[in-house]
A protein has these predicted regions:
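Active-site bordering "gate/hinge" segments
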Residues: 1-226, 250-325
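Active-site and channel-lining beta-strand-loop segments
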Residues: 219-250
Length: 325
């Protein structure tokens, strides 16, 4: 997942015309695959009302603010632009340059987690609560579509419009809609790849500008698959890194993930509910949607994810514990 030819000021090698032609053919295949994936989603999921009802069910709704990178036309962008934040009604409440992120984002700490909980500085930390008064935000495919006014490529724009038409307009708060949003982005990425590889400047041999001074501080932001990714570095007079601050995609979503798990558990487990393996799977769905990597990062060697659910009564006493993994 990490580029091996990145250097200060650029990259170590450009692409040749022969390589460009190979990439062009790959891009065509990628575009067809993206269209196929969306068609498959439509045929298997959208044409099955029970699946649509599951996506829209209250157990998987988490009402938050949203953050994402947009271009000058407020279209989704993965690498450049401004950070845009919208509220629970999809109204813009903040907009800032990536380098100014510390003026807009703060992190809350809980004693039971190594991972911090980012929130919007202008609203403040109000706890693990949903709604318009909460400072919690989400950053992921769902968020990127919610903060944007559209997609920068034609087919992805059509898919974007269908997404919101089907799910009732903006913003979409359904956690399970994350999968559909990811497919819309896949189509955009494939179209964009095809555009870039046909650009006449793509084979320009000038791929690096040697830095002429020692850096002292830098902030970089991209949209990773799991959300907005902030990298912040400070260096000494020799260019050695002395301080690093990272807010990665999963960290942005830490509080919403916790809230989504709680919401799913509360929505699925009622008085008299028999807790089964299938019910554990449906709770698990609430956080796997945030990032495909969570499916890999939270499992044991045999392939099962270690999960424990404790059922408590109104007094907080544990009535039953179910675990696996």
């Amino acid at each position: 997942t990490h580029l091996v030819w990145s250097l200060p000021g650029g990259v170590s090698k450009g692409i040749t015309e022969e390589e460009r032609k190979q990439i062009l053919e790959m891009a065509k295949v990628n575009l067809e695959f993206a269209k196929f994936a969306l068609k498959l989603f439509e045929d298997v999921v959208l044409k099955n009302q029970s699946y649509v009802d599951l996506i829209l069910s209250d157990a998987y709704q988490t009402v938050t603010n949203y953050m994402g990178l947009v271009d000058r036309q407020n279209k989704v962008n993965f690498y450049d632009g401004m950070i845009r934040v919208v509220d629970t009604e999809a109204k813009e409440i903040d907009r800032f340059k990536p380098a100014d992120y510390l003026q807009h984002v703060k992190e809350h700490v809980e004693p039971w987690s190594y991972l911090k909980f980012p929130f919007l500085k202008k609203i403040g930390w109000k706890g693990f609560v949903e709604g318009p008064k909460s400072g919690i935000y989400r950053a992921a495919p769902l968020a990127r579509l919610n903060v944007a006014d559209g997609m920068a490529t034609p087919l992805a724009q059509e898919a974007y419009e269908k997404y919101f038409d089907t799910l009732g307009g903006k913003p979409v708060h359904s956690t399970l809609a994350m999968h559909w949003a990811r497919l819309v982005e896949l189509l955009y990425a494939a179209e964009r790849q095809l555009e870039l590889v046909q650009d006449i400047e793509i084979t320009d041999p000038k791929v690096r500008i040697i830095p002429n001074r020692t850096p002292d501080e830098g902030v970089g932001v991209v949209e990773a698959p799991r959300g907005t990714l902030y990298h912040h570095y400070k260096t000494d007079e020799k260019g050695m890194v002395t301080k690093v601050n990272l807010i990665v995609g999963t960290t942005n979503n830490n509080a919403p993930i916790c809230m989504s798990i709680r919401k799913a558990a509360q929505g699925l487990i009622k008085a008299g509910t028999i807790v089964t393996e299938g019910l554990l799977n449906r709770i698990e769905m609430a956080f796997r949607a945030y990032d495909p990597c969570l499916s890999c990062a939270t499992h044991s060697l045999p392939g099962q994810m270690p999960l424990q659910v404790s059922i408590r009564d109104s007094q907080g006493e544990i009535l039953k514990t179910i675990s696996r993994g």
